[in-house]
């Protein structure tokens, strides 16, 4: 399974695209398609695996989640990866673990809306979820903080869309 990485941004932070692209391609892969979702196209060239999609007129913050929901309703991706625009990679990504996550999502019959790619969950209240090829997977308990986060996660598109208000 090959999925795209989507990164919502705003005009004020378009300048972050260049350093993000550099660190992403250095520490992960130029084979992953990265799609920035913003408003005004940046005035610099993007690497071949990066593209910018304008969500329309940059009118108000109140419309931001509506613009994202409308965009994600317009695509057919079953799964997508998402992070925030200021979450740059600082070291090599373990591609084998990422591939294991994709393999699990393809093979499991369990309902999953969001699969976190960061290790932060183990510092909050969690419980064992499943084991896949020798790796333990955990889920946040209902009382845990930040059960939904846009940082480095794989989302089932339908699940993501229903959480935009």
Regions found by a protein language model. Give the residues of each.
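Short, flexible, basic/aromatic active-site loop/helix in glycosyltransferases
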Residues: 128-145
């Amino acid at each position: 399974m090959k999925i795209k990485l989507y990164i919502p941004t705003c005009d004020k932070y378009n300048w972050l695209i260049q350093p993000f692209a550099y660190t992403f391609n250095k520490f992960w892969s130029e084979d992953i398609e990265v799609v920035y979702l913003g408003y005004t196209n940046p005035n610099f060239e993007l690497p071949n695996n990066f593209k910018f999609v304008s969500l329309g007129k940059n009118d108000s913050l109140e419309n931001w989640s509506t613009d994202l929901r409308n965009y994600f309703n317009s695509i057919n991706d079953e799964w997508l990866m998402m992070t925030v625009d200021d979450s740059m990679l600082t070291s090599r990504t373990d591609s084998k673990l990422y591939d294991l996550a994709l393999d699990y999502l393809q093979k499991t019959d369990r309902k999953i809306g969001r699969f976190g790619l960061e290790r932060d969950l183990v510092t909050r209240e969690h419980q064992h979820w499943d084991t896949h090829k020798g790796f333990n997977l955990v889920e946040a308990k209902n009382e845990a903080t930040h059960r939904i986060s846009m940082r480095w996660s794989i989302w089932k598109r339908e699940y993501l869309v229903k959480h935009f208000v």
